[in-house]
Amino acid sequence: MPVSPSRQNPSIADLPAKFILFGEDDIDDEDLLKEIIGNIDDSIYLLFVGNGKNLLDKLNELPDNHLPCLIVLDYNMPELNGAEILKEIKKNGRYATIPKVIWSTSNSENFRKTCIEAGANEYLIKPSNVTDLVDAARHMLSLC
């Protein structure tokens, strides 16, 4: 499965045409997502960034013709949380057509509402079992 080396950012030239940009600071969640999504569709490259500021920097350096097909954000990340990232992304119209998903352990209605208002297309609760995680991964891939 094509995935980014853990916590390393490939050059833009090395990114395949179709990729998902993940904001995820938990290495275990990253490894699990790599395995599950790779088993579903190994043609999609997964680029993981471990904090909100670095994710925005990576996104802003991408050319218009090489944007991710999906952005998935953990709500609780260092430097900028998922809602703060969404608000920044919303300011730039070039990201308007990219589906954006918040991926969180919190089932707080306030967090969900804040994220949807900030520009998330979906707010998914991180499942506690593998079957539900596979279903969530399939759903994310359907958005890409």
Model-inferred region functions:
Residues 46-56:
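Conserved Asp/Asn-Gly motif in the active-site loop of CheY-like receiver
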Residues 17-38, 71:
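Conserved acidic segment of CheY-like receiver
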Residues 69, 73-75:
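Active-site residues of response regulator receiver
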Residues 77-79:
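Receiver (REC) domain active-site loop signature in two-component systems and cognate sites
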